[in-house]
Amino acid sequence: MSLPGSKLEEARRLVNEKQYNEAEQVYLSLLDKDSSQSSAAAGASVDDKRRNEQETSILELGQLYVTMGAKDKLREFIPHSTEYMMQFAKSKTVKVLKTLIEKFEQVPDSLDDQIFVCEKSIEFAKREKRVFLKHSLSIKLATLHYQKKQYKDSLALINDLLREFKKLDDKPSLVDVHLLESKVYHKLRNLAKSKASLTAARTAANSIYCPTQTVAELDLMSGILHCEDKDYKTAFSYFFESFESYHNLTTHNSYEKACQVLKYMLLSKIMLNLIDDVKNILNAKYTKETYQSRGIDAMKAVAEAYNNRSLLDFNTALKQYEKELMGDELTRSHFNALYDTLLESNLCKIIEPFECVEISHISKIIGLDTQQVEGKLSQMILDKIFYGVLDQGNGWLYVYETPNQDATYDSALELVGQLNKVVDQLFEKASVLY
């Protein structure tokens, strides 16, 4: 008769040999055997070694289903695995169940299955009166609803959790839930509530020690909200802090998050028209040697187009890196403003050598409709981006040099204003005397 330890080794050997179906049967038989033995020893405590073997078997079988891509089997196994966890300590049950659910993240297109598994696990937690487990899984479920874009469901869970955590004065959980609430409101474009939630998260975080990942997420969210306010200088400083935090992490998604934040850092510098800073960041040792992705390449192409004031290069970069640029909500939301800025910059570059130029010639160079170019030039003149006059009858644009305002006029106006005040005061005093 083989011992559980030897069967565990046998299952691992089969996994290494890619005999996944056989390995699955060994793991299941090991769990069923342990379960039956636990039942037979009614009232007797199961030794720590057997519990550790059960825990290992559950986690390794979950990983096996991920490796196999057996989404349906993993969906069925996780709720079923709670039967084996009845003998576990409460803290260990939380750890094992959360680890199994997190493994689902590695399976593509499994968001609905993750939600189903979370809901079933919450039912188990309520049934067994595991309050801490229920809270932990509810946060996970609210996050999954957020990822699924089911914002109403996510907010309903968040509101319930906030009430409970405030009663318990659970600061770490309050930080996580307020941060998630801020993300949800940001997606709903309610920036005022998003900022309020983020402020609440930071207030709770100030009184406790926060894990590096939480600090990184708080800084990232702060940077995003400052970007929405077009305060790109402050946004960059938050993104930089977030990037440093992710850079020092070794979690499974820390590299991807660091690349994402680095992309936002470059976006901030582009929006500030600090292209030299973009080049310095791209040429930095950590960027060249560690962080390379299509998202960063996309921002590099946009920066070059912006530096050259070339709308054609900008549109080329947009087509080449459409997924990386338009698939990200933050970059997409800022691209209209970036397009307008680049269009203005490109038009200024074209008209720079001329005193008088045909609008049709500008339209031909920039590759846009004549009417569209004329409308934009008219707007730029009104905004005093450059000084000129449109001759619509002939289709010409007259460009003038920017007038130098004489400081003497301002001084004279100020002097007249002060004299006016003195005269008014003298008049008031005279009226009192008479």
From Swiss-Prot:
One GO process term, biological-process aspect: proteasome-mediated ubiquitin-dependent protein catabolic process
Keyword Acetylation: yes
Segments forming domain PCI: 235-404
Gene3D superfamilies reported for this sequence: 1.25.40.570
UniProt cross-references to SMART domains, sorted A to Z: PAM, PINT
Record SUPFAM superfamilies: TPR-like, Winged helix' DNA-binding domain
PROSITE patterns xref list: PCI
GO MF entries: structural molecule activity
Role played: Component of the lid subcomplex of the 26S proteasome, a multiprotein complex involved in the ATP-dependent degradation of ubiquitinated proteins. In the complex, RPN6 is required for proteasome assembly.
Family note: Belongs to the proteasome subunit S9 family.
Binding partners and assembly: Component of the lid subcomplex of the 19S proteasome regulatory particle complex (also named PA700 complex). The 26S proteasome consists of a 20S proteasome core and two 19S regulatory subunits.
The protein's name: 26S proteasome regulatory subunit RPN6
